[in-house]
Swiss-Prot record:
Chain positions recorded as Mn(2+) binding sites: 14, 202, 204, 238
Gene3D superfamilies per record: 1.10.238.260, 3.30.160.270, Aldolase class I
GO biological process: L-leucine biosynthetic process
Protein name as it appears in the record: 2-isopropylmalate synthase
Region (Regulatory domain): 392-522
A cellular-component GO term for this protein: cytosol
Cellular localisation: Cytoplasm
Cofactor(s) in the UniProt record: Mn(2+)
Description of how the protein assembles with itself and partners: Homodimer.
Organism whose genome encodes this protein: Shewanella sp. (strain MR-4)
Amino acid sequence: MSNRVIIFDTTLRDGEQALAASLSVKEKLQIAMALERLGVDVMEVGFPVSSPGDFESVQTIARTIKNSRVCALSRALEKDIDAAAQALSVAEQFRIHTFISTSTIHVESKLKRSFEQVLEMAVGAVKYARRFTDDVEFSCEDAGRTPIDNLCRMVEAAIHAGARTINIPDTVGYTVPSEFGGIIQTLFNRVPNIDQAIISVHCHDDLGMSVANSITAVQHGARQIECTMNGIGERAGNCSLEEIAMILATRKNLLGVETGINAKEIHRTSNLVSQLCNMPIQSNKAIVGANAFTHSSGIHQDGMLKAQNTYEIMTPESIGLNRNNLNMTSRSGRHVIKHRMEEMGYSEQDYNLDALYEQFLHLADKKGQVFDYDLEALAFMEAQAAEDNFYQLQQLVVQSDSTEGVATATVRIDVGGEIKTEAATGNGPVDAAYNAIARATDRRIDIISYKLGAKGEGQNALGQVDITAVYHEQNFHGVGLATDVVEASARALVHVMNLTCRADKVADYKQNMHKNRELGGV
């Protein structure tokens, strides 16, 4: 049996299902390119039949990615497989991933079919997918709750039909490691053609067992792990890619397997996914959390000074996190900024150097010293602003009356190329800014959640505002970054405004599509 574990990343498919707002095609491509640099073997990038937008993003990524195999999901239906094959046809190497439910509760309650009918559908889907590619993966949805006899029959039939990879998902995160390991071992013991396919696992974290179950599966013969960056995904999330990669690397002496992951790209990729997906990383998150390599105890600090491995089983440098920061001030030249971005693993195609340097000088004049996290925030904020936004905040001026508690805000906003200036009052500066923006955009939304955080520490921190707003009975999540909390709040609101504008365009597209179908008699 091979000692190489295939890393199958599904951040852009399963991971995206957890997001408050869908990623744009440009954002998905940026993440896909980061995953390629990270060294994932396979990246599942969407469900093409689900929407024109998903089809476009899968096709765009398939056309761009060269070093990783691009995969798309499909149900065990010919129309799904056709859409996946069409979207992937431009790729240098691709995989079609088809699935069907196999547990009794899913077969009877969701599919309302017999197991024999489901078995026939699975075989038909695999055979049909093989018309387009030799690389077909088949998943037994809810395998963790599937009767073992049925699971063995399904796996054997799918392999016989031509599936090269068989995925065993713990779809609802129900199993514990000893149980899940037993399922994998039973498949190896009882399925006669098991050696003709790679066994994969896809574990969810509903009971916090996803990583442990995946590692146990590897110990019992699985050689592909499906995972996401930062563990994002449906409900409680998926198996965390960075945790799996570092467990297999750090405990190679015990587990005896390896991956092709370039661990030095982990920190950079984690931050990119967090920023673009608007999902902050908890401080105590293993591997990539802010406290993962922080030592507060005096005893621990003393031990670290004497020998680093007294309290660290891996180094921050191993995941691409540099311990030493270069002091950057307004006197730093453009080459210093470029050098620091390169040291953090970014290439010039990831950001606009001219725009970043201009923003850097502005921030350095305000803060004095600028840190690595400031540069990353500025780079992503610039990328966000350039994303074909209909609304762009150009200026914000706020005046507050401390005695009356009333504030006045004046905003200048580019609204689709037309500059509008509006003023409004409110109960505090943030409320006033929001009222002025609403007046300038003539777009009404209801804010249901407002969270204020910080990028960095102490007085040098950047303010980060995360808001959730309701528009046409749908929730939208926006984020804003600035040295000033009011400006960060305004940027978060404008971010949401642009998301709702994009949603309106999608709604119009869907309406026209339905009209065309009705006219065509489809």
